[in-house]
């Protein structure tokens, strides 16, 4: 599934991805390509994920991800075929990798072309709540709430 909001700049070779993200690891991973970063559940065998809390142990144990960013204490919960990237701070490392795949997500600027829905032709056609803005490429389908 593609990301509707931001362009994915991948794929990246894992060694290049870690280098661009300023993540130093002792492991010498093969030059495998990583296509995206996803959560533990949806990551597949060409993607990287992250595991930062014991609360997600059950999900981590069945992830299909090619690589997983985690801590040394949580790594034992991952499947054997998932390459572990051991870091001190999982969330910081995840943010760095996300920035590499989706650099525009870091500077998601406000869209100055949005309009107050009260000042559009939709005003009398639909029900809406407070503080609703409409921007470019917005489509309202049937039965939207």
Placement of each model-derived feature along the sequence:
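Domain-scale signature associated with acetyltransferase and cell-envelope carbohydrate enzymes
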Residues: 1-145
